[in-house]
C-alpha cells in the first residue's frame, strides 16, 4: 500500500490552473521530492494532500484512506509549512506544548515529546527564549519539530530551508536525514536542486501545474541531463585532440561528452594529464532541457 497516492489531481483558482492532472505515488519510507520554481503548483498539491484544500477533481489517498480531512488521517501526517506556523511571542517550549495539546497528546506523554523535539532541533538551551528572538534557521527547525510532536509516519515538508543561511540549511539537512533513517515517509517540496539531489529517493519535476518528469535523480540525469563537461590541463599541449571535439580555453581543453571516463582514456593516450575536472549534469540542467528555461526564471 502506498503511503501517499495522488490520482489525476486538478485545482484551479478562477482562470488560473494551479494543478493540472497530477498523478504520483510515494512508497512507505521513501523521500519523494516535488521540484519546481515558485508558482509551479507544489504548495497547492501539498495543501490538497493534507486536506487544507479540496481538489476540483481527482483523488488523494494517505495510508490507504481516501479522505485526508478525516481526523485519523490527519493524525498520521506531520506538516512543516513554508509559512512558519509559530507564535513569536511564545517561547520555543511553549510553542511545542501548544502544538502537542493541539494534537491531543496525553499529559503524561507531552513532556517527553517536548524534550525530544527540543533536543532533535538543537534548541534545548533556547527553550525559554521567545521565538521572536530566534534566528531564521532556529525558527525553521522549531517549525519542523512542531509538526513532529505527534510522531507521524508521513511527514510533509514544504520548502523547509527557504530563507536560511548555509549553516542552518545543513542542520536542517541533518534533521531530515535522521527522519529518513527512522523510516518515515517524507514528501519534500523545494526549488533548490542540490537539496533534491542530496535528500530524495525520487523526484517529480513540476512546472505550470503539470508533472514533466518523475524518476530517481540518477535516471533523470541520464535521461534529461545532457552531457558532462570535461576540462583537462596537460603537462605539454598534445596534438591529435581535434578528433575528439572540444576547444582550448586559457590553456585548458574543454569538451562536452556523454562518456567522461572513455574520453579521459583517449585524452591520456594523447598526452600526460596534469589536472582534470568533470562537471556532471544536475537537476538544473534537467529542468532546462525539459522546459527551455532556468529553474529560477
Each language-model region and where it sits:
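ABC transporter nucleotide-binding domains
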Residues: 2-6, 11-207, 213
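Solvent-exposed beta-strand sheet faces enriched in polar/charged residues
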Residues: 7, 63, 233, 277-279
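Solvent-exposed polar/charged
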Residues: 75, 147, 198, 222-223, ...
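ABC transporter nucleotide-binding domain
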Residues: 171-261
Amino acid at each position: 500500500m502506498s503511503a501517499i497516492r495522488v490520482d489525476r489531481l486538478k485545482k484551479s483558482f478562477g482562470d488560473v490552473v494551479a494543478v493540472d492532472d497530477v498523478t504520483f505515488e510515494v512508497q512507505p519510507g521513501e523521500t519523494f521530492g516535488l521540484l519546481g520554481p515558485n508558482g509551479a503548483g507544489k504548495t497547492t498539491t501539498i495543501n490538497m494532500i493534507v486536506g487544507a484544500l479540496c481538489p476540483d477533481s481527482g483523488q488523494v489517498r494517505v495510508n490507504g484512506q481516501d479522505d485526508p480531512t478525516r481526523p485519523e488521517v490527519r493524525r498520521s501526517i506531520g506538516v512543516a509549512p513554508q509559512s512558519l506556523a509559530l507564535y513569536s511571542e511564545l517561547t520555543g517550549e511553549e510553542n511545542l506544548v501548544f502544538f502537542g495539546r493541539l494534537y491531543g497528546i496525553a499529559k503524561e506523554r507531552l513532556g517527553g515529546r517536548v524534550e525530544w523535539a527540543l533536543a532533535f532541533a538543537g534548541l534545548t538551551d533556547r527553550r525559554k527564549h521567545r521565538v521572536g528572538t530566534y534566528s531564521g534557521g532556529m525558527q525553521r527547525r522549531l517549525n519542523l519539530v512542531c509538526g513532529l510532536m505527534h510522531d507521524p509516519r508521513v511527514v510533509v515538508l514544504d520548502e523547509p530551508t527557504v530563507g536560511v543561511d548555509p549553516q542552518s540549511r545543513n542542520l536542517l539537512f541533518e534533521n531530515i536525514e535522521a527522519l529518513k533513517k527512522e523510516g518515515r515517509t517524507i514528501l519534500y517540496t523545494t526549488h533548490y536542486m542540490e537539496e533534491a539531489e542530496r535528500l530524495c529517493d525520487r523526484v517529480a519535476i513540476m512546472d505550470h501545474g503539470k508533472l514533466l518528469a518523475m524518476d530517481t535523480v540518477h535516471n533523470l540525469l541520464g535521461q534529461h541531463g545532457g552531457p558532462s563537461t570535461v576540462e583537462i590541463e596537460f603537462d605539454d599541449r598534445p596534438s591529435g585532440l581535434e578528433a575528439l571535439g572540444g576547444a582550448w580555453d586559457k590553456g585548458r581543453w574543454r569538451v562536452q561528452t556523454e562518456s567522461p571516463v572513455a574520453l579521459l582514456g583517449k585524452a591520456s593516450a594523447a598526452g600526460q594529464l596534469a589536472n582534470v575536472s568533470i562537471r556532471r549534469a544536475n537537476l538544473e540542467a534537467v529542468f532546462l532541457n525539459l522546459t527551455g528555461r532556468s529553474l529560477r526564471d
